[in-house]
Each structure stands twice: as C-alpha cells, then as structure tokens.
Amino acid sequence: RRIAMLEGLGYIYTPSKNNSFLKKNILKHAHGLLASIGYAFANKVLFLNQDDLVDLAKNSFINSKKSKVIGPIGLELSSYPYTEVVITKPVRFIFVGRMLAEKGIFEYLAAARIVKLKYPNTEFVILGGLDHDNPSALSKDQLTHLISEGLVNYVGNVSNVSEWLVKSHVFVLPSYREGFPRSTQEAMAIGRAVITTNVPGCRETVQDGKNGFITPLFDEEIMAEKMIYFIENPEQIISMGNESYSNAQKNFDANKINPILERLIVGGS
C-alpha cells in the first residue's frame, strides 16, 4: 500500500500582504497537476485539516474517495505534562516558531506595542531562529532594535521549549496557515490558553472563548485586545488553560492516534 500524507499545503496556499495572488494562482495549478500525477498510485491521501483537502481538490484531479482528513498527528503527552499556571505579574505571552511574516511574527510584534502602551511591564517572549535567506523574515537588525528597546525577550532556538511554555501564561500563534500546528498542541497539553488566527490548521485548535481566542488574520489590534483581556482577567488564563489541557487529552494523544494511522496504512478505512 502507498499512503501519502500532507502536513500542510505550504507557501502557495498561504495568504500574504504583497501582490503575489497571480503568481500563487499559477503555482497552485502547477502544483495541482504534479499532485495529481504524484498521488495517482496512492491508496490513501491523508490531510491534517479539511481546508487543505478542499483547496487541493479545487486544483487537482485527486480521487476524492482516496482523500481523508485525520486531524493532528498528536504528541507523546507524557513529554508535555500539565503544569498549572501561576498567575504572577507581569503576564507573559510566548511565540514559538520561525520569525517569518507567514508565521505572524510582525502581527505579534505590533500587538505587543499596542499592549505595552497600556501595560508596559507585559512580557513578550520569542522562541525560534532567524531565517537569513527568506525575504519575508524578520531581519537581524530589526531584531536587535526590538531587543534594545525592550519590546521582546528573544530566546532563540532552544531544546527545552516545554520549560519556556511552562514559564509563560498565554501561547500566541498568529500564523497565516498551518497543517495542524505542533507548537499549539504542546502549549495546550501543558495547559496554556491560546490566541491564534482564523485560518486553516489554527482555527481547529481553539474553541473561541473557551480555551483561548481566534482572531482575524492580519489584525494585530484584535489580537492586542485579547491579550489585554487576559491581563485584566487573569482567572481566565487558568480556566482557559485548563480547557486547553482537557482538549489536548482528548484529541492530541499519540497513543490513541497511532493505532488509527496504523489501520489506515495496513488497509483499514
């Protein structure tokens, strides 16, 4: 059996603020043709979210009977044990990911500026590396300036992401598109509320108003409003974090997900 699994559709399906619509449209058709050929002999084509399946189907000839949405691949939850939030001042928000426009780094920074006008002691942590070869990336000079003005606490690439999640109050991922973000799953497993965007892959992780907030794409003002809500209502950091933990236990346990994948691989439906 041949199984294809797409963990996301990548750059050409990701919205952007520049005028790249025509270019991406052409690339979508080219990608769809290649996908039609490449997956023609696959018994199953697996997707992590429904939008990816629908969007690729619009631009390809993949047999719909082969396509299936499986949701998150999941985590070894014991590696991300629940740790109750300790509500201390200042409130600390955390971004984990490459510092690219498509990951929402610029919206995160813009929201931080808005929040700090009202609550200047609020902390904004960034985990992740610079991407010097990507034109949409935050530059080293920009980062140096942000650090010097005290806007962010830049940690860089680390091997102990979970420890930083534990030390933070709210996880923020303003991404433009995802498959099913592992970083959000990790934060939820530990018991952290989430602020994310209303885009494929991200909106599947949050029940708006229950374990966090879903904000419009590109809208740093609404994002800042939600951050301020947590600052002014710290009890919601705990209750929404607990809801995240509950969702993670139900939906992100690799020990429950792996047998389902195994059945698909060996011939089940």
Question: What spans do the regions from the language model cover?
Answer:
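Donor nucleotide-sugar binding/catalytic pocket of nucleotide-sugar-dependent glycosyltransferases
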Residues: 32-82, 95
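Conserved acidic donor-binding segment of nucleotide-sugar-dependent glycosyltransferases
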Residues: 207-209, 213-220, 229-235
